[in-house]
Amino acid sequence: MVAKILDGKQIAKDYRQGLQDQVEALKEKGFTPKLSVILVGNDGASQSYVRSKKKAAEKIGMISEIVHLEETATEEEVLNELNRLNNDDSVSGILVQVPLPKQVSEQKILEAINPEKDVDGFHPINIGKLYIDEQTFVPCTPLGIMEILKHADIDLEAKNAVVIGRSHIVGQPVSKLLLQKNASVTILHSRSKDMASYLKDADVIVSAVGKPSLVTKDVVKEGAVIIDVGNTPDENGKLKGDVDYDAVKEIAGAITPVPGGVGPLTITMVLNNTLLAEKMRRGIDS
């Protein structure tokens, strides 16, 4: 068996076309979604990622801006900028690029974002809504993972799903989304014992820990669906996933590549949530 390759680039392209159509429809009603991104410092990877978000937003007809603060910016300065965006009626969604410099509390900043503009879905109110099944902003990578599974017609009902990693960004929220689809979910982490026994029984594996080749062919059940969120650069700068891709694709039923799998959907879901934010504040049904 050779796995079906779940091409995130193509899935994202198709999804963004649908978003673009919705943006155009909103514009006809006099509303244009706007994404504001706060970037603190000069980290190269963060700058590149922020530019990608801005470009993607503008490509589908949104307005986007980067609010760039110096590496030495104080927590108060970041909060002041954030409050300005919170109170700016032209801004639909706000995103704060992390990591932040050590003098700025990431948690304090994320909690200061207006929950109705929190397109990353990291505000405690939005996290809480997710866990009681209320409409909210879902973190973008988990939302992208679910779109990949949906696009590939993966039936999750009563399936055994194993999530490796328990972060608030990916592991925990994607576990909740899988539960909503009636999968039986197991979360593995650094303290888990005998991980192989869980993986061998998994119909779906989502790995999001940043450990290259953690998931090997010998622990994957034939026909399993593999979602690889890992993106660790090797010594040559090439991105490596958590999964031994070349070996595992020979036995899996479907698999995401790295790069080109989950990554494109993460940015796409930032756009999705920005559109949702604009619709919600204008009282327009999604």
Swiss-Prot record:
GO terms for cellular component: cytosol. SUPFAM superfamilies: Aminoacid dehydrogenase-like, N-terminal domain, NAD(P)-binding Rossmann-fold domains. Disulfide bonds: none annotated. The keyword Hydrolase applies. GO terms for molecular function: methenyltetrahydrofolate cyclohydrolase activity; methylenetetrahydrofolate dehydrogenase (NADP+) activity. Pathway: One-carbon metabolism; tetrahydrofolate interconversion. Its EC number is 1.5.1.5, 3.5.4.9. It holds the Pfam family THF_DHG_CYH_C. NADP(+) binds at residues 165-167, 190. It catalyses: (6R)-5,10-methylene-5,6,7,8-tetrahydrofolate + NADP(+) = (6R)-5,10-methenyltetrahydrofolate + NADPH; (6R)-5,10-methenyltetrahydrofolate + H2O = (6R)-10-formyltetrahydrofolate + H(+). GO terms for biological process: L-histidine biosynthetic process; methionine biosynthetic process; purine nucleotide biosynthetic process; tetrahydrofolate interconversion. Keywords: Amino-acid biosynthesis, Histidine biosynthesis, Hydrolase, Methionine biosynthesis, Multifunctional enzyme, NADP, One-carbon metabolism, Oxidoreductase, Purine biosynthesis. InterPro entries: Aminoacid_DH-like_N_sf, NAD(P)-bd_dom_sf, THF_DH/CycHdrlase, THF_DH/CycHdrlase_cat_dom, THF_DH/CycHdrlase_NAD-bd_dom. Belongs to the tetrahydrofolate dehydrogenase/cyclohydrolase family. Homodimer. Catalyzes the oxidation of 5,10-methylenetetrahydrofolate to 5,10-methenyltetrahydrofolate and then the hydrolysis of 5,10-methenyltetrahydrofolate to 10-formyltetrahydrofolate. This is Bifunctional protein FolD. The gene is folD.
